[in-house]
Amino acid sequence: MAGRRSSNVFPLSGNSGGGLEVDTPTWLSSQAATSRLMVRPSMGPGICPGPEVWGVPLGSSPYEFRGGIAPYRACEARAWSQSSSEDTCPGPYIALRYMPNLALPEDVSAIQKEMEQLAKELRQKRMTLGYSQADVGFAVGAMFGKVLSQTTICRFEAQQLSLANMWKLRPLLKMWLEEVDEKNLLGICRMEMILEQARKRRRASRERRIGSNLEKLFLQCPEPTPQQISYIAGRLRLQKDLVQVWFSNRSQMGSWPTNDTSRREDVGATGSPFPGPPVCFPMAPGLHFDFTHYEGSCLTPLYSSTPFPVRGALLSAPTTTLGLPRLSS
């Protein structure tokens, strides 16, 4: 199939070929501040339509732009010619897309209307597909190499950004809208895969933190009372049954093969999973206690840390390091 490749974009001679791994699209910015390139991996043969998109064959070598060399990672490159010649993308290739970085046009009123329409379209499409503003910002980063915060998407939809800033975000958000168009099933599937991977990473990270927090508490109190279990469950936002089963399974595993004294010292040094001021954790089973006014004996005070909201998630700690049982609600 025919494709387009810039006449001044070519592999440097003297370098061996090979695969080129590009995990996410990469922005190549111009020192002339007039334009930029977006590098997107793709599989060919394929068509790179229009004079603003060029197909570059995959290879281990960097590519040379007029006035400088630009590897496939983010870097600076000087301005280049927009002229292009017919060429072929024979196999896997990278699509280099020319992204103009233009100032605001003189017709401000027309731009305001366009931005209003784009903001409404973005909000409508996002809500129709059931995505949060944070989902959109993360997906834009995964797809096009520039992560947008939830606040940025929120202010764009509410048209609370300056016109200049909204104009700068316009190309990215329009590309995202094109990607998730109802006719573009591949783009929608790609969006779902990106968000699912992000959810898995967040869930795994949360599970590791919860397992670590429970392990710290276990080293301080291997056999907590029902009142203590209720307190732990409330602070970690877990079900009491899950906490009770975790402590029961952890007790059956026995002590760690390493020195227990060093483990306890590590727990004291790292602090507690609970937020708020220092709290005395009572150790004597069956004692009535009040965490804010308890005057009995206690071990190391528990100091603040970030709470972890968990709603029915699987609980586990890394089996390679903690060897903790995996629980489910």
Swiss-Prot record:
Residues annotated as domain POU-specific: 107-181
Matches recorded under Gene3D superfamilies: Homeodomain-like (1.10.10.60), lambda repressor-like DNA-binding domains (1.10.260.40)
One Gene Ontology CC term in the entry: nucleus
Positions of region (Disordered): 1-24
This protein's UniProt keywords: DNA-binding, Homeobox, Nucleus, Transcription, Transcription regulation
Residue ranges of DNA binding: 199-258
Cellular location(s): Nucleus
GO molecular function: DNA-binding transcription factor activity; sequence-specific DNA binding
Cited SUPFAM superfamilies: Homeodomain-like, lambda repressor-like DNA-binding domains
Tissue expr: In adult brain, expressed in the olfactory bulb, becoming specifically concentrated in the mitral cell layer. Also found in the pyramidal cell layer of the hippocampus, in the granule cell layer of the cerebellum and in the cortex.
Database matches in InterPro entries: HD, Homeodomain-like_sf, Lambda_DNA-bd_dom_sf, POU, POU_dom, POU_domain_TF
PROSITE patterns: HOMEOBOX_2, POU_1, POU_2, POU_3
CDD domains: homeodomain
Broad class of the protein's primary localization: nucleus
Bias (Polar residues) ranges: 1-14
Listed transmembrane segments: none
Family: Belongs to the POU transcription factor family. Class-5 subfamily.
Task performed by this protein: Transcription factor that binds preferentially to the octamer motif (5'-ATGTTAAT-3'). May exert a regulatory function in meiotic events that are required for terminal differentiation of male germ cell.
Protein name: POU domain, class 5, transcription factor 2
Organism of derivation: Mus musculus (Mouse)
